[in-house]
Curated annotation (Swiss-Prot):
Region entry Disordered, spans: 78-100
Pfam families the UniProt entry points to: CREG_beta-barrel
Keyword set includes Secreted: yes
Keywords from the named record: Glycoprotein, Secreted, Signal
Signal peptide location: 1-31
The protein's name in its UniProt record: Protein CREG2
Glycosylated residues in this chain: 164
One cellular-component annotation, GO: extracellular region
Length: 288
């Protein structure tokens, strides 16, 4: 019989080889998906991580920086695993939070072990008040151009003779001084005493404005010295300022003193210490 008219049987080996060739050609494209006209390799692990990180990382990525059009986002696990592999300069530096108070100063607390006690502060204040021969008196101005504003005057002072400190500053004033006109309307004033004549500033040749030099501020009411204390006021002022005896008499000089109500001491680079009035008058100035 002739086999030319019959259908030729298919060989299993040829079909198997054809399938193997097709699979070999298509196997490199198994890890690719087509999105528009751009393709990239996506594995199952990355696909799962991207799905899980889509809701966690999308919002922070939008809030980080809006200055660039292109934003690079990574899964949370990639940040943790690749931190040690990245150079230090590759991470974007986040701006430091702004300070809440730029010009705020720390107040001195009484619980600090290093801070001196009230008695030491009171002694320093009394020493500074006794050593000072001048100070700046700030009054509330009555001048029409600066009415209600502070007005400062540098005046000679004395808290008593050399060996008799009282802690109360005395003044030798004239009615023609603008500060006196202010005190008639408002007797409240502040007296600032810098440590310009102290031992520390002299020995170390430090400017009086240096924070290491103490500054004392006395606040209270300015009053005229009563007749019974005029003789003591003369001794206090003329013993420290002998030239006052020869000042022109037509200026009608008279004595005033400050009734101290508040004491503030600023020393070193720290804050301001509020010294109780009782401690201030109880303390004694250091001997020179």
């Amino acid at each position: 019989m002739s086999l030319s008219g019959r259908e030729r049987p298919a060989w299993p080996g040829s079909r198997l080889s054809w399938l193997l060739c097709c699979s070999a050609l298509l196997s490199p494209a198994a890890g690719y998906v087509i999105v528009s006209s751009v393709s990239w390799a996506v594995t199952n692990e990355v696909d799962e991580e991207l799905d899980s990180a889509s809701t966690e990382e999308a919002l922070p990525a939008l809030l980080e920086d809006s200055s660039s059009i292109w934003q690079q986002s990574f899964p949370a696990s990639a940040h943790k695993e690749d931190t040690h592999l990245r150079p230090r300069g590759s991470a974007r530096a986040r701006p430091a939070p702004a300070a809440r108070g730029m010009f705020s100063y720390r107040r001195e607390s009484g619980s600090s072990e290093a801070s001196p006690g009230p008695r030491v502060h009171a002694g320093t204040a009394r020493s500074l008040a006794h050593a000072s021969s001048w100070g700046c008196l700030a009054t509330v101005s009555t001048h029409e151009k600066i009415q209600g504003l502070p007005f400062g005057s540098c005046l000679a002072i004395s808290d008593g003779p050399v060996h008799n400190s009282t802690g109360i500053p005395f003044f030798y004033m004239t009615a023609k001084d603008p500060a006196v006109a202010d005190l008639v309307k408002n007797p409240t004033a502040s007296l600032v005493l810098p440590e310009s004549e102290g031992e520390f500033c002299r020995k170390n040749i430090v400017d009086p404005e240096d924070p290491r030099c103490a500054r004392l501020t006395l606040t209270g009411r300015m009053v005229t010295v009563p007749p019974g204390e005029v003789e003591f006021a003369k001794q206090a002022m003329f013993s420290r300022h002998p030239g006052m005896r020869k000042w022109p008499r037509q200026y009608e000089w008279f004595f005033m003193k400050m009734w101290v109500e508040h004491i503030w001491l600023q020393k070193w680079y720290g804050g301001v210490s509020d010294i109780p009035r009782e401690e201030y008058f109880k303390a004694a100035p250091r001997k020179a």
